[in-house]
Amino acid sequence: MGVKLQAVQSLQALDVELFRFVNERLANPFFDVVMPFASGNVFFVPLVLATGILLVWKGRVRGLVCVLMLALVLPLGDGLIYRTIKHAVGRPRPFLTLTEVRRPGGKNDAKARPPPSTAQPNGRPPASGSGSMPSAHAANWFAATMIAFIYYRRSIRFMLPLALLVSFSRIYNGVHYPSDVVAGAALGAGYAAAAVWLLAALWGSSGRKWFPILWARLPSLLDPTLHPAPGSSEVGHLAEDTRHELQ
């Protein structure tokens, strides 16, 4: 037991040291502007919406299936899995427990000390706040990266750098430890791959029974290929088949 406890304490100390390195030693005026922006939604929400529209328009059935997977998998993971784990682990964020934490773009741009009223006696984050482990930002971005990679292999060239940038920004901004980000990335990528596989398997087994016409045209959600009738678009024909099945 003593050896295990010592190992855990060593890992925690390493986690704090890595956090300090990113949050303090890598600090510079350029990152102080870029990293809060990378963690925010001002740019990324319109980008995601525009990308979704472009995928449906240009990607035809493959793009439509990819967007549907993103719309199904990401909200479920963020609202149920990640938040449940955050509450169960109850790890306070770095700026709540460590001194001299930089929070660029936050309420305190200078080095901040943890407010005495924010942490509960048991060390858990306040009820109105959000825990540190895992990072939902990292989980969501790596989940999106995994789903995009499943349907578009070349997307890894720009999705992975974006996911890494957002994840790094969470440490730099003082709101997550490195282990929070690593755990979130692994959880998000693994959960997304499993969810896509499960939904595809469910479609393969139940689609044949409940939507035979649509299933005959689109038997696989992992490699979505539709053979439309002459003179009709793939997405348009898929929508027509769906309406027919639901009538």
Identify the residue ranges that each predicted region occupies.
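N-terminal transmembrane-helix/juxtamembrane module of multi-pass inner/ER membrane proteins
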Residues: 1-47, 81-127, 243-247
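Membrane-interface elements of multi-pass transporters and channels
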Residues: 25, 29, 57, 83, ...
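Membrane-helix interface segments
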Residues: 30, 59-65, 151-158
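Alpha-helical transmembrane segments of integral membrane proteins
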Residues: 35, 65-73, 155-158, 179-183
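Interfacial segments of alpha-helical transmembrane regions
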Residues: 48, 52-81
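Alpha-helical transmembrane segments in multi-pass membrane proteins
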Residues: 69, 73-78, 82, 86, ...
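Transmembrane helix-bundle signature of multi-pass membrane transporters/permeases
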Residues: 71, 102-105, 163, 185-186
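Membrane-embedded catalytic cores of phosphoryl/pyrophosphoryl-handling enzymes
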Residues: 115-247
